[in-house]
């Protein structure tokens, strides 16, 4: 049986080998790190009173770290107790030690906050590569968090950028954010209210003459009124019957009503604010290219350009109506212009996404959908297969019924979609026994298909939600860096006096101390007990 070697300890800073000979710190480091027999020796690591025991060869897997390099960890060696002492977070060291045992797997314990565990990674010097991989696994922001966000170099531009881009930066920035949210809400309310029949009739200036149907002052046809559901979709349009006396006399009235309409005036004020906000943010942004790559800025552009297109089209239309007499070709061109304009102005509804700039919940939802694109793609693919399968099955099951509501397989696509999604619209339904069996299987398959990827999406949402919560807490509290011996040292139980113990402690004082965060002075401090 191999005799177990041991280390005989002498005075502080002095180590004796297996035969009792005296060794200095350098010889002890070489004996500890090199050689096949010594690499299997075990050592004790004391983390704030909790003792861990491991082998030297386990720590030597990562020689560039604090524990893997004998020259670095010897500064924490306590010759009085024959152990390495670290006044650090105890739950975190389980994961740190597992990093060595597993060959590079770094997993944060669930009961350790993110910022505290990252401090432990830096203290034990696991390296920037391990820290970057850990941050990527945790889905963290780039190193430095809020301090690393690009800011303009000019002081005035920086202040303007913070005012309009970061509502949490100051009180005036929060005030601007509140104004922006109110303007967005007013714009959305106006977009909805202007489609009400009573407002459209009042805005047009009256009703029809003798038929009981609301028409514009120019006596437009009922078909044109249906097409013009917007408040300012060509209020000066020429009626289908040509430009008569009544139409000519009311042309100027129509043009005036467009620009004096209350909905148009409120919409104009909202657009003025949106345009001002966009131009100010663009002029103060640190990178013009990155500005247009931001999806929120693209939404801002999409939210305002329909107004200018509508306004320009209205001015051109008024000019053409005043210079060209009516006709069928002119009316057809107007009808096409109306259809195009309605599609363009429908984009105004995307203005509601501007709220996501000021809503953490919408941002979390967007990140969840972005992270769940693979699962959503699988869901759509499964639904596509089910729609093809069950629409074909119900068509052939109902083919012998003369009253069948499924004239073809493509017509049955709609039924398959609403059945698999458990909506059950009711406009199409099977009437034969075989068709009802197919419908039952379709509903069951739809429930299973939709239920499979939902837990993954919910898990992604919980992940982003808890990450956002931790980042908010990190902005309020910061863990106090510990590990340095206190200057007020007291006498110990082994008989050493206060001066002797202080001298021995200075010899073991670590040269590596974590650099305090730049923003620590500006935050409330939370000391770990």
UniProtKB/Swiss-Prot annotation:
Location of the region described as S4-S5 linker in the Swiss-Prot/TrEMBL record: 360-373
Chain positions with Phosphoserine modification: 3, 511
Residues anchoring lipid (S-palmitoyl cysteine): 285
Stretches that traverse the bilayer: 172-193, 263-284, 296-316, 338-358, 374-395, 437-465
Feature: compositional bias, Basic and acidic residues: 500-510
Ranges within the bilayer without spanning: 410-421, 422-429
Entry keyword set: Cell membrane, Ion channel, Ion transport, Lipoprotein, Membrane, Palmitate, Phosphoprotein, Potassium, Potassium channel, Potassium transport, Transmembrane, Transmembrane helix, Transport, Voltage-gated channel
Notes on the domains: The N-terminus may be important in determining the rate of inactivation of the channel while the tail may play a role in modulation of channel activity and/or targeting of the channel to specific subcellular compartments.
Subunit structure: Homotetramer and heterotetramer of potassium channel proteins. Interacts with KCNAB1 and KCNAB2.
Single GO MF descriptor: delayed rectifier potassium channel activity
SUPFAM superfamilies documented for this protein: POZ domain (SSF54695), Voltage-gated potassium channels (SSF81324)
Motif Selectivity filter boundaries: 422-427
Biased composition (Polar residues): 210-219
Name of the gene: Kcna6
Short name of any one Pfam family annotated for the protein: Ion_trans
Residues in compartment: Cytoplasmic: 1-171, 285-295, 359-373, 466-529
Extracellular topological intervals: 194-262, 317-337, 396-409, 430-436
Name the UniProt record assigns to this protein: Potassium voltage-gated channel subfamily A member 6
Any Gene Ontology biological process: potassium ion transmembrane transport
Domain of life of the organism encoding this protein: Eukaryota
Catalytic activity: K(+)(in) = K(+)(out)
Subcellular locations according to the entry: Cell membrane
Chain span(s) of sequence motif PDZ-binding: 527-529
GO cellular component, one term: intracellular membrane-bounded organelle
Family annotation (InterPro entries): BTB/POZ_dom, Ion_trans_dom, K_chnl_volt-dep_Kv, K_chnl_volt-dep_Kv1, KCNA6, KCNA6_BTB_POZ, SKP1/BTB/POZ_sf, T1-type_BTB
Topology term for the membrane: Multi-pass membrane protein
Sequence segments annotated as region (Disordered): 1-35, 203-238, 488-513
């Amino acid at each position: 049986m191999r005799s177990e070697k041991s280390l005989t300890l002498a005075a502080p800073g002095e180590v004796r080998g297996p035969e009792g000979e005296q060794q200095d710190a350098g010889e002890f480091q070489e004996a500890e790190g090199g050689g096949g027999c010594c690499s299997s020796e075990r050592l004790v690591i004391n983390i704030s009173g909790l003792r861990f025991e491991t082998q030297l060869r386990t720590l030597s897997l990562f020689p560039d770290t604090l524990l893997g390099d004998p020259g670095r960890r010897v500064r924490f060696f306590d010759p009085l107790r024959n152990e390495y002492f670290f006044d650090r977070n105890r739950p975190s060291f389980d994961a740190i030690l597992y990093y060595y045992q597993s060959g590079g797997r770094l997993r944060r314990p669930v009961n350790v906050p993110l910022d505290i565990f990252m401090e432990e990674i830096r203290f034990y010097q696991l390296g920037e590569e391990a820290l970057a991989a850990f941050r990527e696994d945790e889905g963290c922001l780039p190193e430095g968090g809020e301090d690393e966000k690009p800011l303009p170099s000019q002081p005035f531009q920086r202040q303007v950028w913070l005012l309009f881009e970061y509502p949490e930066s100051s009180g005036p920035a929060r005030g601007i954010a509140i104004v922006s949210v109110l303007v967005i809400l007013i714009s959305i309310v106006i977009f909805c209210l202007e489609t009400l029949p009573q407002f459209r009739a009042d805005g047009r200036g009256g009703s029809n003459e003798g038929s009981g149907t609301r028409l514009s002052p120019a006596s437009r046809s009922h078909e044109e009124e249906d097409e013009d559901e917007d408040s300012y979709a060509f209020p000066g349009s020429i009626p289908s019957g040509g430009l008569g006396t009544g139409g000519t006399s009311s042309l100027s009235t129509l043009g005036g009503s467009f620009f004096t309409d209350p909905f148009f005036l409120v919409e104009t004020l909202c657009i003025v604010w949106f345009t001002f906000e966009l131009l100010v943010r663009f002029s103060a942004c640190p990178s013009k290219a990155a500005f247009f790559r931001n999806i929120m800025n693209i939404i801002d552009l999409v939210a305002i350009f329909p107004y200018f297109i509508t306004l320009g089209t209205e001015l051109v239309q008024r000019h053409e109506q005043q210079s060209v007499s009516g006709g069928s070709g002119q009316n057809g061109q107007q009808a096409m212009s109306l259809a195009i304009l309605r599609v363009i102005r429908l984009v105004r509804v995307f203005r509601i996404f501007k709220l996501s700039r000021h809503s953490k919940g919408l941002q979390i939802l967007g990140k969840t959908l972005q992270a769940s694109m693979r699962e959503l793609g699988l869901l759509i693919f499964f639904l596509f297969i089910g729609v093809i399968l069950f629409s074909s099955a119900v068509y052939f099951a109902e083919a012998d019924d003369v009253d069948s509501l499924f004239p073809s397989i493509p017509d049955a696509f709609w039924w398959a979609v609403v059945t698999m999604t458990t909506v059950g619209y009711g406009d199409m339904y099977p009437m034969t026994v075989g068709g009802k069996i197919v419908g039952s299987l379709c509903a069951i398959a739809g429930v299973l298909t939709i239920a499979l990827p939902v837990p993954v999406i919910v898990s992604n949402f919980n992940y982003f939600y808890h990450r956002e919560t931790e980042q908010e807490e990190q902005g309020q509290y910061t863990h106090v860096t510990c590990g340095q011996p206190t200057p007020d040292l007291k006498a110990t139980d082994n008989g050493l006096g206060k001066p002797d113990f202080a001298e021995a402690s200075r010899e073991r004082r670590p040269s590596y101390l974590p650099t305090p965060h730049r923003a620590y002075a500006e935050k409330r401090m939370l000391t770990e007990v």
